[in-house]
Amino acid sequence: MNTNRDAMAARCPKAKPLGGFYLPDHRLTFRGVADFRYDSDMVLPVVLWEITHDCLRALDRLEGYPTLYDRRKINGDWLIYDMNGNKGALGTPSSGYYDMIEQGYKDFGLDDWYLRAAAKDAELAA
């Protein structure tokens, strides 16, 4: 997930954070790395960034586009990376990856309950 301010500054120095928000009807999941699925009872904490074309290319490389993740437009012009294929089984994230997302949630005032719940779901499924 591209929630962490420092990580985004390193990979996309010209990206401008527009803030954190909650995407309705979606749930954070982990398949080793972050993904999401439809869930009418949940929200997905995300960070909206204004990015350049160079930043998009850098994010595409990072996200394994178009092999691992595909791009999906939501709310008009907003872009989100969505894992391809049948998405496979849930899997726990590495502690470093989890910590990076957690710091991003803190950076933007997002509730980390959703992060902890997704990690717990992945742990129980393993």
Task: Name every feature range the model reports, one short phrase each.
Residues M1-A126:
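Glycine-aromatic micro-motifs
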